[in-house]
Swiss-Prot record:
Binds directly to 16S ribosomal RNA. GO terms for biological process: translation. NCBIfam families: S20. This is Small ribosomal subunit protein bS20. It comes from the Bacteria. Belongs to the bacterial ribosomal protein bS20 family. GO terms for cellular component: cytosol; small ribosomal subunit. Pfam families: Ribosomal_S20p. GO terms for molecular function: small ribosomal subunit rRNA binding; structural constituent of ribosome.
């Protein structure tokens, strides 16, 4: 239990930050799944368009340090490889 006023305030702020970070993390997972769904669907043009929008989402979440930059790079690399592996 937080005893000092400072600790109580930090606990309140942590609750808000946790909710916000969870929301951003959910956006990340949704963006990744959208690209994967387009790849499975077989439409390369749609997959590329979805990938372009997802890249900015992934980068912005990494910039906010919600995920590590290397994890963001790994996601982008794997999604890009999946799109390149598709037959045109």
């Amino acid at each position: 239990m937080a005893n000092s006023a400072q600790a109580r305030k930090r606990a309140r702020q942590a609750v808000v930050a946790r909710a916000h970070n969870g929301s951003l993390r959910s956006r990340l997972r949704t963006a990744i799944k959208a690209v994967q769904k387009a790849v499975v669907g077989g439409d390369k043009a749609a997959a590329q368009a979805t990938f372009r929008t997802s890249m900015s989402t992934i980068d912005s979440i990494a910039d906010k340090k919600i995920i590590h930059k290397n994890k963001a790079a790994r996601h982008k690399s794997r999604l890009s490889a999946a799109i390149k592996a598709m037959t045109a």
